[in-house]
Each structure stands twice: as structure tokens, then as C-alpha cells.
């Protein structure tokens, strides 16, 4: 018996679900070169426009001169350097919590936190639309795992009634494919009433949300008692790479002792932490970035609604255009690309069957003119969906 990989791949192609990697040949930003083609991109997560900021680049260069280019060891051996520690302290200050702990990426942070906190005999309850890393973490934890209806505190309450052992309620802060935000006050109230802990992965909330960019917890004015476990990523609004968990002294010490994805990996380059310290400073001080981004979101939504496009209930930089059929979503993405715009088609299994969409993401680095170009292209391209066959584009 052998692995029949070709049949699996062919099935993906037939269902318009086959994925290919675009080759980015320029720095990240609104104006990019992909596979040799200049494009105006609306598909990255650089919400604050810091991924190519000259001060962040200079901080990385200076960090490399001072600290070298590699972490060299795991944090618990000799890989925890001064820049790592300073960044953890700055992230703790941003979130208003005693401690923060750096991870190499968001997947590892989520996996590490969930599996360190619950196991056999415990319960994990997750929103059914959570990010794949959270769902994987729940399954791999060994705890009893159940998903409640999307953003539905009543559905969560019904599952809390059946929970056993230590119970961890897990949700995205901003849902990455829909752009809506979790009803944290209701979820926190439900969790606390049953003695459960609430864990929030706010990967897409840090930066755009909150008066100081501290995310959805700041947006709702909640405390560490409401949300004991707060996760953030550094590869989106911070413009660099990595992730963190913020919480109490006891939580962070527990993760240091028991979070295997933290313990058994080499630390990120110290120079990267230097760059993130600079981007964090810019995120907190340059409030115009959040204000400009909010203005662009409003501009896009008004224009898209005038065109009759079906949007999701989102005031975040994630603005999906619902299409439904995967082939039609691919076709619209290709039509836009032919006009010099890059907007990714999102298809199953990333989203449920029948809910394929174009996922527009906006950045503080975009201009009003950029958004207007997108709206004009959508006005031209959307009617063409019914006038042509759905074909598989080169990339989507």
C-alpha cells in the first residue's frame, strides 16, 4: 500500500481549492511586485503600516550589530537575551498585566498556552470559527473539547453546564475571516460565573482596537480578571514577527515550566526583538495611524455598500466580500488582478463550504486614492462574474 497523493491533489484542483504561493519580489506594503507584476495589494496583515518602516529597519540593523543574527539556544538554556526581556516588559506594560512571555509565532503561543493549562480530565470550549491554531491546540490538549456557536454566550453557557475539571473558554478577539469581534463582556461573564478562565487570541485586534492600540480587551475596558489569558501576535500590526502571552505572574511562570512549544525551541533573533520594541513605540505614539485606518474602513464600506456588495458586520481592517461559490471568488480575484489589484480569494476549508469570499484587508499605509481604485475596479469587475465562466487563476 502506498500514499495516493496525486488523487488528493487532483481532487483539490477539481474543486477549485488548490493553492499556490505567490512570489513577493518587493518589500511588504500596499504597492508590491508579485511574480514580476506590479500590484496594489489589499491582502496583508500589516495593519499599522510598520513592516517596512525605516525606523524599525534601523532598529533591526542596530540590534544585529549589537546582538548578532541568531538566538543561539532556547530561552531556558542561554537564548533569553536582554532585548527579549525588554520586549516582554514593554508588552506587559502595553496590556496592563504583570508579565508577558515571547513565543516564536502565534501558532506556538496558542498551542503552548492551551496545552499547558488543560489536559485529560479538563474541558476546552471554543468558538466554532476560531483560528485553526486554537482548534488544533484544543484537540491536542487531551482535554474534553467542544465548540460553541459563533459568538453565542447562550451556546457557551449550555456547554459550561456540562464542563468537567479546569475549564478554558477560548475565542479569537477579531475573527480573521469575517472581521467581526468577540462579545467579550458576555463571554467573560459566562466564564466567570462557572469558574472558567477566558483566553483571547487578539492577533488582529492589537493595533486597530483600543485607545492605545492595546486591542479588544482595552476596547471593552475589561480587566485581567475578565480575561486571564491574552495572546497577541507581532507579525501583523507590529510589522515584525513572533507572538506573546500576557497575564499574571503565576500564568507566565506556568507557561515557562509547562508550555512545550516555548521550552523546546530556539529563541527568536534578539535583533528582531529590537525591531519590535521600536514598532511598539510607534504603534503607541502615532495615533494618526489608527485614525487614518478607521477612515479608510469607513470609506471602503460606504463605497462597497453603494455597489451592492455583500459585506460582513465588521468595523475592523478585515472586510470580506461574500461571494459563496469558490470558482466565482477565484474569478473575481483574477479579474481584479488583471486590473493591477491583489485581493485574495478565501475558500474552504479555511471557511465553511458555500461561503467563499474576497478578503479585503486595509492598512494605515493605504491612501484614500488606493481605496478608491479598489472600489472602481470592483464596480467594473463584479458584473463580469455572471458574464464569464469561472476559471482557476494562477494564484488565489
Swiss-Prot record:
Positions with a binding annotation for pyridoxal 5'-phosphate: 106-107, 176, 204, 233
What residues does substrate bind to? Answer: 19, 131, 350
Q: Which parts of the sequence carry N6-(pyridoxal phosphate)lysine?
A: 236
Give its E.C. classification number.
2.3.1.47
| Pathway(s) | Cofactor biosynthesis; biotin biosynthesis
GO annotation terms (biological process): biotin biosynthetic process
Named from the GO MF annotations, one term is:
pyridoxal phosphate binding
A matching Pfam family: Aminotran_1_2
Which cofactors are required for activity? pyridoxal 5'-phosphate
Classification via PROSITE patterns: AA_TRANSFER_CLASS_2 (PS00599)
Q: Which InterPro entries match?
A: Aminotrans_II_pyridoxalP_BS, Aminotransferase_I/II_large, AON_synthase_class-II, AONS_Archaea/Proteobacteria, AONS_Proteobacteria, PyrdxlP-dep_Trfase, PyrdxlP-dep_Trfase_major, PyrdxlP-dep_Trfase_small
Please give the catalytic activity noted in the UniProt record: 6-carboxyhexanoyl-[ACP] + L-alanine + H(+) = (8S)-8-amino-7-oxononanoate + holo-[ACP] + CO2
Key words of the record: Biotin biosynthesis, Pyridoxal phosphate, Transferase
Q: Which family does it belong to?
A: Belongs to the class-II pyridoxal-phosphate-dependent aminotransferase family. BioF subfamily.
What is the documented function of this protein?
Catalyzes the decarboxylative condensation of pimeloyl-[acyl-carrier protein] and L-alanine to produce 8-amino-7-oxononanoate (AON), [acyl-carrier protein], and carbon dioxide.
> How is the quaternary structure described?
Homodimer.
What is this protein called in UniProt?
8-amino-7-oxononanoate synthase
State the species of origin.
Answer: Pseudomonas syringae pv. tomato (strain ATCC BAA-871 / DC3000)
Amino acid at each position: 500500500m502506498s500514499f495516493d497523493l496525486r488523487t488528493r491533489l487532483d481532487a483539490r484542483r477539481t474543486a477549485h481549492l488548490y493553492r499556490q504561493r505567490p512570489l513577493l519580489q518587493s518589500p511588504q506594503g500596499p504597492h508590491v511586485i508579485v511574480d514580476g507584476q506590479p500590484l496594489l495589494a489589499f491582502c496583508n496583515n500589516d495593519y499599522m503600516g510598520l513592516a517596512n518602516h525605516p525606523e524599525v529597519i534601523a532598529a533591526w540593523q542596530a540590534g544585529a550589530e549589537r546582538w548578532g543574527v541568531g538566538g543561539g539556544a532556547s530561552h531556558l538554556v542561554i537564548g533569553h537575551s536582554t532585548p527579549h526581556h525588554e520586549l516582554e516588559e514593554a508588552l506587559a506594560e502595553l496590556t496592563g498585566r504583570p508579565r508577558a512571555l515571547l513565543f516564536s509565532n502565534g501558532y506556538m503561543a496558542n498551542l503552548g498556552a492551551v496545552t499547558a493549562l488543560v489536559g485529560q480530565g479538563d474541558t476546552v470550549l471554543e468558538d466554532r470559527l476560531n483560528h485553526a491554531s486554537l482548534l488544533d491546540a484544543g484537540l491536542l490538549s487531551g482535554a474534553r473539547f467542544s465548540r460553541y456557536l459563533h459568538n453565542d454566550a447562550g451556546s457557551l453557557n449550555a456547554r459550561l453546564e456540562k464542563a468537567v475539571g479546569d475549564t478554558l473558554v477560548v475565542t479569537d478577539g477579531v475573527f480573521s475571516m469575517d472581521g467581526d469581534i468577540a462579545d467579550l463582556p458576555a463571554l467573560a461573564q459566562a466564564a466567570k460565573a462557572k469558574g472558567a478562565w477566558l483566553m483571547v487570541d487578539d492577533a488582529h485586534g492589537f493595533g486597530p482596537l483600543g485607545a492605545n492600540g492595546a486591542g479588544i480587551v482595552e476596547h471593552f475596558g475589561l480587566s485581567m480578571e475578565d480575561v486571564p489569558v491574552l495572546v497577541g501576535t507581532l507579525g501583523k500590526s507590529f510589522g515584525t514577527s513572533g507572538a506573546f502571552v500576557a497575564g499574571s505572574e503565576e500564568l507566565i511562570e506556568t507557561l515557562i515550566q509547562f508550555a512545550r512549544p516555548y521550552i523546546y525551541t530556539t529563541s527568536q533573533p534578539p535583533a528582531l526583538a529590537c525591531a519590535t520594541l521600536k514598532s511598539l513605540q510607534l504603534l503607541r505614539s502615532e495615533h494618526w495611524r489608527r485614525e487614518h485606518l478607521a477612515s479608510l474602513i469607513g470609506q471602503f464600506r460606504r463605497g462597497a455598500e453603494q455597489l451592492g456588495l455583500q459585506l460582513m458586520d465588521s468595523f475592523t481592517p478585515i472586510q470580506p466580500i461574500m461571494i459563496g461559490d469558490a470558482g466565482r471568488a477565484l474569478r473575481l480575484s483574477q479579474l481584479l488582478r488583471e486590473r493591477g489589484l491583489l485581493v485574495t480569494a478565501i475558500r474552504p476549508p479555511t471557511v465553511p463550504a458555500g461561503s467563499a469570499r474576497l478578503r479585503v484587508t486595509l492598512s494605515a499605509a493605504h491612501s484614500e486614492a488606493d481605496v478608491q481604485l479598489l472600489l472602481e475596479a470592483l464596480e467594473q469587475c463584479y458584473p463580469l462574474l455572471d458574464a464569464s465562466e469561472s476559471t482557476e487563476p494562477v494564484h488565489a
